[in-house]
């Protein structure tokens, strides 16, 4: 069973600024649950695209029923991104490495320059929540995770904008 969340957001910053801020968005006051972000691999290919693979460690509170299942409040996330300056496109994919017997969350994001205003960036996000659990428990896990994801998505966008203001648009 799979639950899906989609989101489209317009950021008030150019694609160049957003793609630069993307790589340095942690830490920020809107992502206190991100304990660490470590680069595992980074390279530029022959066409000038920047590939990055990072390990994120996130920590947070779980509902009582989930803490009984997991007995841990940390999660390890793999993030892969490709920044293509020639297309002015940033694509990212993130997914959890642990707790996959309970829930797998896969998030895809695409950042492109707005065709109407070059000082804005469009972000399309699709997140998939897949749980192998049965007897209604999988549905419950997906529903909770989907709700939390939707709540944290706006916080994530605010964090990125915070980094943009602090590092790329100083007053």
From Swiss-Prot:
Location of region: Required for mitochondrial targeting: 1-79
Pfam family, one: PRELI
GO BP term, example: phospholipid transport
Keyword Thylakoid tagged: no
Localization, UniProt: Mitochondrion inner membrane; Mitochondrion intermembrane space
PROSITE patterns found in the cross-reference section: PRELI_MSF1 (PS50904)
Annotated keywords: Membrane, Mitochondrion, Mitochondrion inner membrane
Main location (coarse class): mitochondrion
Membrane topology: Peripheral membrane protein
UniProt GO cellular component terms: cytosol; extrinsic component of mitochondrial inner membrane; mitochondrial intermembrane space; mitochondrion; nucleus
Domain (PRELI/MSF1): residue spans on this chain: 2-171
Record has tRNA processing as a keyword: no
A single MF term (Gene Ontology): phosphatidic acid transfer activity
First and last residue of the signal peptide: none
InterPro entries xref list: PRELI/MSF1_dom (IPR006797), Slowmo/Ups (IPR037365)
Summary of the function given for this chain in its UniProt record: Required for maintenance of normal mitochondrial morphology as well as PCP1-dependent processing of MGM1.
The protein's name: Protein ups1 homolog
